[in-house]
Amino acid sequence: MRNKICKELNNTDIGKLVNLCGWVDRRRDHGGVIFIDLRDHSGFLQITINPDDGAALFKQAETLRNETVIMVSGIINERPKDSINTNLSTGELELKVKDLQILNQIKKNLPFPVSIHDYENTKEELRLKYRYLDLRRGKLLENLKTRHKIIKVAREFLDNFGFTEVETPLLTKSTPEGARDFLVPARLSNGEFFALPQSPQLFKQLLMVGGLDKYYQIAKCFRDEDLRADRQPEFTQLDIEMSFISEEEIISFNESLIKKIWKEVLNIKFNNAFPRMSWQEAMDNYGTDRPDTRYQMLLKDLGGILGDIGFNIFTKAIKSGGYIKSITVKGGNSSISNVRIKPGGDIFQVAKDAGAGGLAFIRVKGDELETIGAIKNNLSEEHIADILKITEAKDGDLILLGAGDKLIVNQSLDRVRQYIAKDLNLIDKSKWNFLWVTDFPMFERNEEENRYEALHHPFCSPKNIKSKDSENLKKEIESSTANAYDLVLNGLELGGGSLRIHEANLQREVLKMVGLTDKEIDEKFGFLIEALEMGAPPHGGIAFGLDRITMLIIGTDSIRETIAFPKNQQAKCLLTNAPSNVSESQLKELDIEITIDE
């Protein structure tokens, strides 16, 4: 049907007969000549139709509406100099039409304009409902092509290092991995269910047990969890696993992979190794294990200074084993008013939404500290000097303080730090601040259920374990950090991984420590334990979030802009209206009865 696409045309095509297919982007009638901007997936070309070319052809062109699908044949001409469009690669050319065929006439009014000339901000819900029209606008198509290039670069890199791409099952066993599983009823096994995988974790480990040595997969994963801008119920991982490998080797290799992607896709080269930071250092200084290091405002511990000044909130925080921490906003006295950090203010609300009761604040004015009387009246000159030294605050700076439970103080000051950095334009958006976070704890304590929870997952190998007997082994695991590592970019986790447990007794002990009985271990993970008893090699790996990598590379705030047909924030597909009801006969075949709470 066509022998060229728009972007292929250049001055060497002048005088040639070409066939093009595409959409009418817009039509203009000027002085008896019809000008049409033809759009295909690659770009635009102006086509012209003159009454002298034939009355029937001209009349047909007059009927064309935007988004009509056409095929045109004609001669490529050079545009008159006064009509050259320097914004287009084909802006010096036009097609003088000899023949026009309407392949599909537009029959419905469009829900929103597609043409770049009529572009308007359209509500995302409408864009998701008519995703095929949104794709035609071009930006989304470019995003998908960028995503394709990222995958292509990764595949070539891994192939060159001897990796084998293997597909793992999408219908698998429900195992506790943190989020809820999507369950699939098994018709041939009454009352039993498959689960869609949250990750290929166990299968890729079993591939290592099977001797594959180096594996990767562009893996679809599923988690039934509450959504936000950078989450989807189904998402894609670049999943990697290797045998006979150290933590250092995994980090070094995957850093090279990420550098390769950035070089090939963005032409950005990183000469130095990515910096590293322990989990504890990240939590102490940033309040999060995903720190954005493009700006300052580090958290500072003031518990040793303010814990005994007699201010009840501070005293209570320290006595209960909590924190008093601060962040310093440079020039904050002039940029942030009291209204914003008191109840009802936007900054106060950010802290409250993160679990804090509120924020205390100190304004530095010369050598004086201005704050509420209950704090100020109990500060000695030594207190003031120590506060200024630790916070590095100067005249005109604002010190914000959080006090209470360690987790809540870290979480609330982290959120406030991020919010203020955006609000005051403190973030250099040209920076790519990669960071490896290492030495994660093996567990975090679930006080409500009085048990441990794995911080990454219960298949991470603890560091420096020597004991073989169960009691000493448990003590060593409790005090150990994990052979785990995350790659963070500008405050977002790009990927995470670990060395895996490859000894059956150690794996069983870790699973028991997260609350599983021996019976539950055998029921849920018996196949893994058995495999580890049959000569499993030391192995480890990492999984990168492909959607998030693409999101950062194309410079958007939502991974929905990187996916052809995403779900909305209620996990619904507005295009197909999924999920949807199914017929009674389908449910009957599965022996499923639905009851809905009133």
UniProtKB/Swiss-Prot annotation:
L-aspartate binds at E177, R223, H456, R500. It is found in: Cytoplasm. Pfam families: GAD, tRNA-synt_2, tRNA_anti-codon. GO terms for cellular component: cytoplasm. The record marks H30 as: Important for tRNA non-discrimination. InterPro entries: Aa-tRNA-synt_II, aa-tRNA-synth_II, aa-tRNA-synth_II/BPL/LPL, Asp-tRNA-ligase_1, Asp-tRNA-ligase_1_N, Asp/Asn-tRNA-synth_IIb, AspRS_core, GAD-like_sf. Keywords: Aminoacyl-tRNA synthetase, ATP-binding, Cytoplasm, Ligase, Nucleotide-binding, Protein biosynthesis. It comes from the Bacteria. GO terms for molecular function: aspartate-tRNA ligase activity; aspartate-tRNA(Asn) ligase activity; ATP binding; nucleic acid binding. ATP binds at R223, D224, E225, Q232, E493, G545, L546, D547, R548. Its EC number is 6.1.1.23. Its main location: cytoplasm. Signal peptide: none annotated. GO terms for biological process: aspartyl-tRNA aminoacylation. It catalyses: tRNA(Asx) + L-aspartate + ATP = L-aspartyl-tRNA(Asx) + AMP + diphosphate. Residues 201-204 are annotated as: Aspartate. Aspartyl-tRNA synthetase with relaxed tRNA specificity since it is able to aspartylate not only its cognate tRNA(Asp) but also tRNA(Asn). Reaction proceeds in two steps: L-aspartate is first activated by ATP to form Asp-AMP and then transferred to the acceptor end of tRNA(Asp/Asn). Homodimer. Belongs to the class-II aminoacyl-tRNA synthetase family. Type 1 subfamily. This is Aspartate--tRNA(Asp/Asn) ligase. It comes from Prochlorococcus marinus (strain MIT 9301). The lineage of its organism: Bacteria, Bacillati, Cyanobacteriota, Cyanophyceae, Synechococcales. The gene is aspS.
